[in-house]
Regions:
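Conserved acidic segment of CheY-like receiver
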Residues: 6-17, 22, 53, 71
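C-terminal output helix
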Residues: 107-120
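Conserved phosphotransfer microenvironments
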Residues: 51-75
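A short, hydrophobic beta-strand element within the central beta-sheet of small alpha/beta folds
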Residues: 78-89
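Two-component/phosphorelay signaling modules centered on CheY-like receiver
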Residues: 15-34, 38-40
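Acidic, metal-coordinating helix/loop segments flanking the phosphotransfer/catalytic sites
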Residues: 34-52
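Alpha4 helix (beta4-alpha4-beta5 surface) of REC/receiver domains from two-component response regulators
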Residues: 66, 87-105, 114
Length: 122
């Protein structure tokens, strides 16, 4: 896939080392816009053709779950897959009704890459 044809995804992760590891791996297949907080994320969702959002809900003092709900309220006509990659196992607490996949850390970058490819291609 040529660089200009890479699909765009958002990666929101508060830990800069984890962010760099995930971004490096995901960049093999995607144009990754990486954020350590929520500043600028909605603007990118509005202006770009984002194909998936990968988020650590604990980003920005735990407001990640509210942000996931905001995505679905602000963009009801777009089906943007959300992949939660979290240190907390909250997958069974019904918080992820808008979540396409829930991964509990530690998650290898390759595993996240494969899951993202699977979801974006479906």
């Amino acid at each position: 896939m040529a660089k200009s044809q890479k699909l765009e995804i958002l990666l929101i992760e508060k830990d800069e080392i984890t962010l760099e590891l995930y971004q490096r791996e995901l960049s093999k297949s995607f144009n990754v816009m990486a954020f350590t907080d929520l500043d600028g994320v909605l603007e990118n969702l509005t202006r770009r053709d984002i194909r998936a959002v990968i988020i650590e809900p604990e980003t920005c003092t735990g407001q990640g779950w509210d942000f996931i709900n905001t995505i679905h309220k602000e963009f009801p006509d777009r089906s943007i897959p959300i992949i939660v990659c979290s240190t907390r196992d909250e997958s069974s607490q019904n918080r992820g009704k808008h979540v396409s996949s829930y991964l509990t850390k530690p998650v290898l970058p390759k595993t996240l890459h494969e899951k993202t490819l699977e979801i974006v291609k479906s």
